[in-house]
């Protein structure tokens, strides 16, 4: 029995659907994207979709037609940070200098509210409300979301999950959004849509004025890890039991990478291979939401402790078996902007001058200044405001 994913405006919809579900078929590469719209109504349909082939098809077509601002980097370097022992990719990204921004306020601003006129301007200049059809991968996901390509991608097959209606980037992720993220990661990394190159996808959400975001419309991003880089978080969560939400406060503390220069918190996730009942699916959703809110509350303690004027800002990063949060106090250090990518070992810059500056300042210094410094007794720190 086939799921009820809908393809509109394309006469051979059922054939296409069969190809999307079958990762061994590559005829989908011949689809002309503008003749097809894709609707995914349930998480189960999303799990069974050959998502990577669909993303790849839309990306390759858009690139060939000039709808993307992208070219492969020719000067990418992998550099090990002598302090953190983390391997970092440093490269010049063509689209960064052309990428527009549509922020509610500039980093460092002490404005506490957004004027109505400013909000209206942002909505007018919002690229996600009516995305370009050539960049759209899934037109409707669970009725409330879209999956679209990043027009100025940092790497191949860089895409976004966006809300259909305008929502602020500073709003919290809700339980269904967390479950969609987790389902997409499962699909791309080990499910029907697993990409054949071996690279692994991660997701990231930049929230708050100092988080490094450029667009105020709510969006979560997905990118592949460079093949040469192993996420340090994998070593942190290896041989560790997953967190059980009800046991967090009593028995467990979040994990962290001890060689890092910046405060961050990592939680190991339970991996679900399949769901036999609706109750199991709800259990995953509730668990992800509880763990995410635990990280949010712990981050709020950081801002309270530092009595920082900055509104809550953070980078939330997730893979299939862990989630991490990095509280942020600065969006940039000496003109070097950082969003979540730096905390995954990816330093992407506009030009050679900025590349040399990154190498001169050092990865650990940049990340420490953009986040909060990791303390020597970090593993013994107890926060009392929320009981964590």
PLM ranges: what are they?
Residues 1-35:
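N-terminal amphipathic/basic-hydrophobic helices that include classical n-h-c signal peptides
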Residues 3, 196, 214-215, 309, ...:
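Intrinsically disordered, low-complexity regulatory regions enriched in Ser/Pro/Gly/Thr
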Residues 35-173, 226-275, 279-388:
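Active-site microenvironments that recognize anionic phosphate/pyrophosphate groups
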Residues 143-145, 157-158, 199-203, 216-220:
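Generic beta-strand structural signal
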Residues 157-202:
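Short N-terminal edge-element motif at the start of the domain
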Residues 163, 204-230:
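Histidine-centered divalent-metal-coordination microenvironment in nucleic-acid enzymes
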Residues 181, 203, 220-222, 235-237:
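Compact, aliphatic and Gly/Pro-tolerant "microcore" segments centered on a short helix or tight beta-hairpin
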Residues 196-211, 307-321:
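A short glycine-rich, hydrophobically flanked beta-strand micro-motif that places a catalytic Asp/Glu
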């Amino acid at each position: 029995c086939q799921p009820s994913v809908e393809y509109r405006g394309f006469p051979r919809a059922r054939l296409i659907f069969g190809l999307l579900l079958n990762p061994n078929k590559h005829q989908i590469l011949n689809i002309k994207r503008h003749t097809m719209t894709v609707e995914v109504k349930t998480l189960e349909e999303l799990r069974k979709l050959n998502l990577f082939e669909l993303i790849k098809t839309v990306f390759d077509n858009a690139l060939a037609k000039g709808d993307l601002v992208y070219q492969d980097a020719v000067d990418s370097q992998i550099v090990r940070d002598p302090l953190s022992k983390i391997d970092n990719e440093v490269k010049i990204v063509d689209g960064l200098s052309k990428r527009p921004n549509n922020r509610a306020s500039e980093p460092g601003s002490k404005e506490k509210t957004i004027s109505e006129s400013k909000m209206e301007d942002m909505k007018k200049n919002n690229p996600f409300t009516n995305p370009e059809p050539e960049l759209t991968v899934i037109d409707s996901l669970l009725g409330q979301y879209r999956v679209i390509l990043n027009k100025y991608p940092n790497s191949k097959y860089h895409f976004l999950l966006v809300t259909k209606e305008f929502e602020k980037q500073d709003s919290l992720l809700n339980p269904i959004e967390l479950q969609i993220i987790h389902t997409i990661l499962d699909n791309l990394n080990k499910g029907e849509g697993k990409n054949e190159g071996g690279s692994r996808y991660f997701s990231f959400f930049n929230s708050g004025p100092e988080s490094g975001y450029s667009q105020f419309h709510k969006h979560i991003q997905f990118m592949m890890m460079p093949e040469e880089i192993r996420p340090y978080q994998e070593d942190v969560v290896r041989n560790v039991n997953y967190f059980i939400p009800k046991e967090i406060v009593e028995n467990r503390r979040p994990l962290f990478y001890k060689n890092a220069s910046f405060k961050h918190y990592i939680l190991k996730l339970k991996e679900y291979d399949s769901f036999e009942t609706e109750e199991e699916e709800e259990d995953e959703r509730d668990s992800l939401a509880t763990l995410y809110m635990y990280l949010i509350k712990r981050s709020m303690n950081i801002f309270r402790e530092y009595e920082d004027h900055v509104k809550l800002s953070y980078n939330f990063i997730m893979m299939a078996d862990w989630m991490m949060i990095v509280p942020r106090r600065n969006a940039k250090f000496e003109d070097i902007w950082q969003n979540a990518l730096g905390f995954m070992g990816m330093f992407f810059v506009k030009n050679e001058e900025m590349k040399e500056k990154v190498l001169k300042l050092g990865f650990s210094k940049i990340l420490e200044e953009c986040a909060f410094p990791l303390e020597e007794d970090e593993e013994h720190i107890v926060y009392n405001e929320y009981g964590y």
